[in-house]
C-alpha cells in the first residue's frame, strides 16, 4: 500500500505482484520511460494518477494492471504514457472510474493502444472517462459493457479531438439503466469509422455525438 504519496519509479520500471492482496497506490511518476505493471490476481487494485508530470515526455512508458477481484481496478486519476513505441495501457479485469479520469496514450511521435477486458463502470459519483489514443487502437473485449452493473458513468469521451483510428464501441448500459447519464462524444471528423457492434445502447439525458470522417462508411449499427 502506497497511500501517503507518489511512488517514483526509476531505471526500467516497477512490478507490484500479490497473491490476492489488495494494492493501493496514490500516484506513480517516472523519469526515463519506465514501465508499470500491477498484478493483484484476486485482490482489488486502487490507483490514482500515473505519469503525466514529466515535461520531457519521458515519464511512464506503459501501464498494465490486472485484477480478477469482483471490485477490480479503481482508477481515480489520469494515466499518461510517454513518447515511445509500445506506450500502451492494458487493464485486465473490471474497471471502476472514480472521478475524472483521462487515459492518454497520444504523444508527439508515438501513440499507444488502450485495452479493456471487462466492464467499465462509475463509482456512484460524478465519474467522467476520456480516452485519447491518437493512432493507437482502443480495444474493448467482447464482454465489455460501459456503465455495467447498473453503475453509469457521468460523461464519456472517446477520441473526440484528432485521431483517425477506427473505433468499435461495445454495449453501453442495460435494458433498464443508462450506461452514461450525461454527455457522450465518440470520434471526430478524422475518425475512419465508428462501429456500434452491439444491440443495446442506453444513454441518459445528455447530448450524444458520434462522428466519423466524411466519405467513408461513417457510423454503423
Q: Which role fits each region the language model picked out?
A:
Residues 1-221:
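Extracellular lectin-like interaction modules
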Amino acid at each position: 500500500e502506497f497511500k501517503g504519496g507518489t511512488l517514483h519509479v526509476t531505471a526500467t520500471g516497477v512490478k507490484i505482484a500479490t497473491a490476492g492482496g489488495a494494492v493501493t497506490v496514490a500516484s506513480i511518476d517516472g523519469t526515463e520511460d519506465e514501465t508499470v505493471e500491477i498484478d493483484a490476481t484476486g485482490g482489488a487494485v486502487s490507483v490514482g494518477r500515473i505519469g503525466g508530470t514529466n515535461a520531457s515526455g519521458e515519464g511512464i512508458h506503459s501501464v498494465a494492471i490486472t485484477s480478477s477481484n469482483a471490485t477490480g481496478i479503481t482508477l481515480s486519476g489520469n494515466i499518461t504514457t510517454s513518447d515511445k513505441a509500445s506506450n500502451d495501457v492494458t487493464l485486465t479485469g473490471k474497471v471502476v472510474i472514480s472521478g475524472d479520469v483521462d487515459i492518454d496514450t497520444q504523444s508527439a511521435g508515438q501513440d499507444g493502444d488502450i485495452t479493456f477486458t471487462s466492464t467499465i463502470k462509475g463509482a456512484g459519483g460524478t465519474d467522467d472517462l476520456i480516452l485519447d489514443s491518437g493512432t493507437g487502437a482502443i480495444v474493448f473485449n467482447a464482454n465489455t459493457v460501459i456503465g455495467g452493473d447498473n453503475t453509469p458513468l457521468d460523461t464519456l469521451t472517446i477520441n473526440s479531438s484528432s485521431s483517425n483510428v477506427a473505433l468499435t464501441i461495445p454495449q453501453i448500459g442495460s435494458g433498464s439503466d443508462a450506461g452514461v447519464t450525461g454527455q457522450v462524444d465518440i470520434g471526430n471528423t478524422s475518425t475512419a469509422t465508428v462501429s456500434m457492434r452491439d444491440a443495446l445502447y442506453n444513454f441518459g439525458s445528455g447530448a450524444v455525438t458520434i462522428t466519423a470522417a466524411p466519405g467513408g462508411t461513417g457510423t454503423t449499427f
